[in-house]
């Protein structure tokens, strides 16, 4: 998993509340267990017309936001059924940070396991960031995970809180496998001691 230390990029505004996982990645895209290629299905029902052509009015289809790395979204983002394909689709599109006032718990935790930083801010700060994100190609935000700070295009900054363990994992690019490997020496030492003291179980 790639480390997340500091991210600077275009922020796309999505002022919609209760965006559920079916909106993020429709069920038609859940047949694969591959993490790549799902970016085309991100918000598919909003991004495309029934004939498969792009909906020019959807934010991620607008030229200024096609390469967005940050999504500023309405309250309760990621609600609905549990599907890890949702963060996979965001990541494959290129989005590594989602900012909202709240997230569904399962989606929130799945983000960290896949290298995406979900940030919770107050409604007042979300309104400010949504306004910043509405500036088109000038909607550049910098998310500094080391200092827990978001800097807007006008230079103003917003602080955010994050569980220290989750912060450590993102800063060091550690998913569940990475965390296990980080304890590799301790695990090997235990296995050797356990085998020596319980030879019948070896």
UniProtKB/Swiss-Prot annotation:
Keyword Lyase: yes
Catalytic activity annotation: (2R,3S)-3-isopropylmalate = (2S)-2-isopropylmalate
Top enzyme category: lyase
GO cellular component, one term: 3-isopropylmalate dehydratase complex
EC number: 4.2.1.33
GO terms of molecular function: 3-isopropylmalate dehydratase activity
UniProt-listed InterPro entries: 3-IsopropMal_deHydase_ssu, Aconitase/3IPM_dehydase_swvl, AconitaseA/IPMdHydase_ssu_swvl, IPMI_Swivel, LeuD
Keywords associated with the record: Amino-acid biosynthesis, Branched-chain amino acid biosynthesis, Leucine biosynthesis, Lyase
Assembly with partners or alone: Heterodimer of LeuC and LeuD.
Protein name: 3-isopropylmalate dehydratase small subunit
Source organism (scientific name): Rhizobium leguminosarum bv. trifolii (strain WSM2304)
């Amino acid at each position: 998993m790639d480390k997340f230390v500091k991210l600077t990029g275009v922020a796309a505004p999505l002022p919609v509340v209760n965006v559920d996982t079916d909106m993020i990645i429709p069920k038609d895209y859940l047949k694969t267990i591959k993490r790549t290629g799902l970016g085309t299905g991100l918000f598919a029902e909003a991004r495309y017309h029934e004939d498969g052509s792009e909906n020019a009015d959807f934010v991620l289809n607008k030229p200024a936001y096609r390469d967005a790395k940050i999504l500023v979204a309405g309250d309760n983002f990621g609600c609905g059924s549990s599907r890890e394909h949702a963060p996979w689709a965001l990541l494959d599109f290129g989005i590594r940070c989602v900012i909202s006032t709240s997230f569904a718990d399962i989606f929130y935790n799945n983000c960290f396991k896949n290298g995406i930083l979900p940030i919770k801010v107050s409604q007042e700060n979300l309104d400010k960031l949504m306004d910043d994100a509405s500036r088109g190609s000038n909607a550049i935000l910098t998310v500094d995970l080391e200092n827990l700070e978001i800097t807007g295009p006008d230079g103003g900054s917003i602080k955010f809180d994050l569980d220290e363990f989750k912060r450590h994992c993102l800063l060091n690019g550690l998913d569940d496998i990475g965390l296990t490997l980080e304890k590799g020496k301790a695990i090997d030492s235990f296995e050797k001691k356990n085998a020596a003291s319980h030879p019948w179980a070896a």
